[in-house]
Curated annotation (Swiss-Prot):
List of residues binding AMP: 33, 38, 59-61, 87-90, 94, 162, 173
Chief localization: cytoplasm
Binding residues for Zn(2+): 132, 135, 152, 155
Designated name of the protein: Adenylate kinase
Subcellular location: Cytoplasm
Residues annotated to bind ATP: 12-17, 129, 138-139, 201
Main EC class the enzyme belongs to: transferase
Keyword Cytoplasm annotated: yes
Function (record text): Catalyzes the reversible transfer of the terminal phosphate group between ATP and AMP. Plays an important role in cellular energy homeostasis and in adenine nucleotide metabolism.
Keywords: ATP-binding, Cytoplasm, Kinase, Metal-binding, Nucleotide biosynthesis, Nucleotide-binding, Transferase, Zinc
Family: Belongs to the adenylate kinase family.
Transmembrane intervals: none
Natural source organism: Acholeplasma laidlawii (strain PG-8A)
Pathway this chain belongs to: Purine metabolism; AMP biosynthesis via salvage pathway; AMP from ADP: step 1/1
Length: 217
């Protein structure tokens, strides 16, 4: 069973959902860059304070800061049996850093899962999201609606659509993703690590396909 993996894919393709499911199924940590940033920023670590300078301005955190957070995370005991990266690496430079980091500890990546979805499916998925401003619960108008339309099941707050979930923002993010990530996809394809997964399918079908890939020798 492959246990050291990376999930890549455009926003809304479902890579985060799959990473969480596989993490629970295989009992290995799901390492999301967003979670790493939040943990360091909340803990006011030197890396967190450095990252905050950029996130507060809506800028990407520089590679050297992100890479050091990854190095710190991979030094923890819970990654010995495997790990799932979600949102990292973002560029070939980060991928090379990760390769070298794993080499030092006699480890290597098993597979890179590219969850791809059509722009139309992604736009429909994301624009349907609604978030509770109080508890942070996420719903979807079609796929996971609240019991009462527009109202959070947990606290009765009125659900909102985040700016990030609006159509214009999504189209812009998809364009940036394609431009930024194509070199990374090419890098892993060249190393024969890339496996494509059709993200247009239902969640459970995607999970089944992912598990089949992980079980291949």
């Amino acid at each position: 069973m492959k246990t050291r993996m990376i999930f890549v894919g455009p926003p809304g393709a479902g890579k985060g959902s799959q990473a969480k499911i596989i993490s629970q199924t295989l009992n290995i940590p799901h390492i999301s860059t967003g979670d790493m940033f939040r943990t360091h920023i909340k803990g006011s670590t030197p890396l967190g304070l450095e990252a905050k300078k950029y996130t507060d301005q809506g800028l990407l955190v520089p590679d050297d800061v992100t890479n050091q957070m990854v190095k710190d995370r991979l030094s923890q005991k819970d990654v010995e049996k495997g790990f799932i990266f979600d949102g990292y690496p973002r560029t070939p430079d980060q991928a090379i850093f990760l390769d070298n980091l794993l080499m030092v500890t006699n480890q290597k990546l098993d597979v890179v899962l590219n969850i791809s979805s059509s722009d139309e499916v992604i736009v429909k998925r994301i624009t349907g999201r609604r978030t509770c401003p109080v508890c942070g619960a996420i719903y979807h108008v079609d796929n996971y609606p609240p019991k009462v339309a527009g109202i959070c099941d947990n606290d009765g707050a009125t659900l909102v659509q985040r700016k990030d979930d609006q159509k214009e923002t999504i189209i812009r993010r998809l364009s940036v993703y394609k431009e930024e990530t194509f070199p990374l996809i090419k890098y892993y394809a060249h190393k024969n690590l890339l496996m494509d997964v059709d993200g247009n399918q239902p969640l459970e079908v995607i999970t089944k396909h992912v598990l089949e890939i992980l079980e291949q020798k």
